[in-house]
Amino acid sequence: MSSVSYGLSPQVQELSEIMFGQRHRLALMAAIAQSDGIVNPSELADILGFRAQSSLQMPLKRLVDAGLLTRISGLEGRVYYRREDSHAWAFALELVARALTSEDAATQ
């Protein structure tokens, strides 16, 4: 997974706040949707451009609570999550695309 530009997008954060009541959940969901299905919080923070993984802890917990992620054991004491099948991942990508389209329109 490579670095994504929408992690710190004000439009993505605003739409995330509207949809989920939390400004990082949408970008997090999109990054997970684009992954191979196994993700690590530290790697996600780096990919999204966040300084620390602490901003992802509650959104990850909520995704586990919703049954969209399953926490799995990792190597060397690292935590990993497995993405579960759901249309929610495609929905997250659609929302990010909409937010970025509105961002592009606003800058033109």
Give the residues covered by each predicted segment.
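Short, cationic-aromatic polyanion-contact patches
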Residues: 18-24, 40, 74-97
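Short amphipathic alpha-helical interaction segments
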Residues: 50-65
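Exposed, interaction-prone assembly regions rather than primary DNA-binding/catalytic cores
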Residues: 4, 17, 46, 53, ...
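Amphipathic alpha-helical dimerization/coiled-coil segments
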Residues: 4, 88-108
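A short, conserved structural fragment
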Residues: 64-74
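Short acidic, hydrophobic short linear motifs in intrinsically disordered regions
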Residues: 37-47
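Short alpha-helical segments that sit at the start of domains
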Residues: 2-28
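Short amphipathic alpha-helical elements of helix-turn-helix/winged-helix folds
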Residues: 30-35
